[in-house]
């Protein structure tokens, strides 16, 4: 792997121990995957933020690092709402450790808006062809597929290393040859809303880590593409997909039709909706974090109603502050709008035995990461389950 003179000096420790560790990680990955050199990146998105997932060892490692990131960098969701952690019954001990983790990242110059949808934030723009070092699976999929940027599935340490250096190793999805579709997926039904999450859950299991190209009967919105990619990244390991006539590379590139073809039928999606579980104790929406359009829809569905089950709606703090009217309407129902975290990486979910989700990603992750059953429905079904379809009465305390 070719290194410039400056990069060799960094590897030799002449720029300090933190940068030596960082370039050592990237060079090791580059050697494993056959990278020819390091390339500059536009931004980094760093996983390994929740105390639930990284523990004391992770906190100690991050705290020992020095210096400042060279490119815009942002954090993945933490293990709690950083401003209102008590209402989800997070312990003070966990909260203290979580705050230490965020502060350790902040001292490195990293933006501490903890979200899995960084592409929605002001001042964190991503464009077609940009090279990135992102590490949250749904954000990787969105950047690669919906925007046409280029990032591998970075781990937390490699994304942080890339942020500190402003570079990453040139392999994988940074190269044209690895962005070519490997399997064609034909969907034999029209889709809307959470159907795309169900499709992603089914397709990910069939595709694994390959690059699919979809032939769809419906034209998906960006939130639906977000759901599709997030679910495929969770049930499989898909980091890049194409949709004929929709996603940018499928529109710009003249891809050859893959030899392998998969057909997915409505009955396979119905199996996701019909998954059996206990009566849900918790309703969760926003995995990945809700967009403005999704917050608006949740507010419309909850207006004038009262939830009778614990209901959490996750979004980024920036969007929650940008749309206070949606947040107010949602919370008047008794539902909680939660920022900085999600149902998967927060320990708060662990006290429930069955969780209803409108996300194929959460449907895949909740059983393994939270020890709960997951049942699936669209946003309207989730809110109907939360409210029992009941209108809020005059004088209701919510």
UniProtKB/Swiss-Prot annotation:
An example Gene Ontology biological process: isoprenoid biosynthetic process
Pathway listed: Isoprenoid biosynthesis; isopentenyl diphosphate biosynthesis via mevalonate pathway
GO terms, molecular function: 4 iron, 4 sulfur cluster binding; lyase activity; metal ion binding
CDD domains on file: AcnX
InterPro entries referenced in this protein's UniProt entry, alphabetically: PMDh-L-like_dom
EC number(s) recorded for this UniProt protein: 4.2.1.182
Entry binding sites for [4Fe-4S] cluster: 116, 287, 342
Keywords: 4Fe-4S, Iron, Iron-sulfur, Isoprene biosynthesis, Lyase, Metal-binding
Cofactor remark: Binds 1 [4Fe-4S] cluster per subunit.
Catalytic activity line of the entry: (R)-5-phosphomevalonate = (2E)-3-methyl-5-phosphooxypent-2-enoate + H2O
One Pfam family in the UniProt entry: AcnX
Chain residues that bind (R)-5-phosphomevalonate: 48-50, 76-77, 136-137, 361
Named cofactor requirement(s): [4Fe-4S] cluster
Assembly, per entry: Heterodimer composed of a large subunit (PMDh-L) and a small subunit (PMDh-S).
Stated role: Component of a hydro-lyase that catalyzes the dehydration of mevalonate 5-phosphate (MVA5P) to form trans-anhydromevalonate 5-phosphate (tAHMP). Involved in the archaeal mevalonate (MVA) pathway, which provides fundamental precursors for isoprenoid biosynthesis, such as isopentenyl diphosphate (IPP) and dimethylallyl diphosphate (DMAPP).
PANTHER family in alphabetical order: DUF521 DOMAIN PROTEIN (AFU_ORTHOLOGUE AFUA_6G00490)
Assigned protein family: Belongs to the AcnX type II large subunit family.
Name of the molecule in the record: Phosphomevalonate dehydratase large subunit
Protein's organism: Methanosarcina mazei (strain ATCC BAA-159 / DSM 3647 / Goe1 / Go1 / JCM 11833 / OCM 88) (Methanosarcina frisia)
Source lineage: Archaea, Methanobacteriati, Methanobacteriota, Stenosarchaea group, Methanomicrobia
């Amino acid at each position: 792997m070719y290194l410039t003179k400056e990069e060799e000096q960094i590897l030799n420790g002449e720029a300090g121990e933190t940068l030596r560790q960082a370039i050592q990680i990237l060079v090791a990955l580059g050697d494993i995957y056959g990278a020819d050199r390091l390339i500059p990146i536009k931004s980094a998105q760093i996983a390994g933020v929740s105390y639930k997932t990284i523990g004391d060892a992770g906190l100690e490692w991050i705290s020992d690092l020095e210096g400042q990131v060279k490119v815009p960098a942002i954090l993945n969701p933490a293990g709690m709402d950083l401003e209102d952690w008590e209402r989800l019954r997070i312990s003070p001990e966990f909260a203290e450790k979580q705050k230490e983790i965020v502060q350790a990242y902040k001292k490195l110059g990293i933006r501490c808006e903890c979200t899995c949808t960084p592409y929605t934030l002001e001042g964190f723009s991503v464009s077609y062809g940009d090279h990135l070092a992102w590490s949250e699976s749904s954000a990787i999929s969105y950047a690669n597929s919906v925007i046409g940027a280029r990032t591998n599935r970075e781990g937390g340490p490699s994304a942080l290393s890339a942020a500190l250096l402003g570079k990453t190793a040139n392999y994988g999805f940074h190269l044209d040859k690895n962005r070519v579709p490997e399997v064609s997926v034909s969907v034999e039904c029209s889709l809307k809303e959470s159907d795309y999450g169900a499709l992603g859950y089914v397709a990910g299991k069939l595709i694994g880590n390959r690059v699919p190209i979809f032939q769809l009967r419906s034209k998906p919105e960006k939130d639906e593409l977000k759901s599709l990619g997030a679910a495929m990244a969770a049930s499989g390991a898909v980091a890049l997909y194409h949709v004929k006539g929709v996603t940018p590379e499928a529109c710009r590139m003249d891809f050859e039709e893959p030899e392998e073809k998969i057909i997915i039928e409505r009955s396979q999606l119905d199996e996701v909706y019909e998954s059996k579980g206990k009566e849900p104790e918790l309703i969760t929406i926003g995995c990945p974090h809700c967009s403005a359009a999704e917050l608006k829809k949740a507010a419309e569905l909850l207006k004038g109603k009262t939830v009778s089950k614990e209901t959490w709606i996750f979004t980024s703090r920036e969007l929650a502050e940008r749309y206070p009217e949606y947040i107010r309407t949602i919370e008047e129902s008794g539902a909680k709008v939660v920022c900085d975290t999600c149902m998967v990486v927060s320990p708060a979910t662990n006290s429930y035995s069955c969780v209803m989700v409108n996300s194929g990603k959460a449907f895949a992750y909740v059983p393994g990461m939270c020890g709960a059953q997951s049942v699936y429905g669209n946003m309207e079904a989730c809110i109907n389950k939360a409210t029992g379809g009941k209108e809020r009465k005059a004088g209701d305390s919510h």
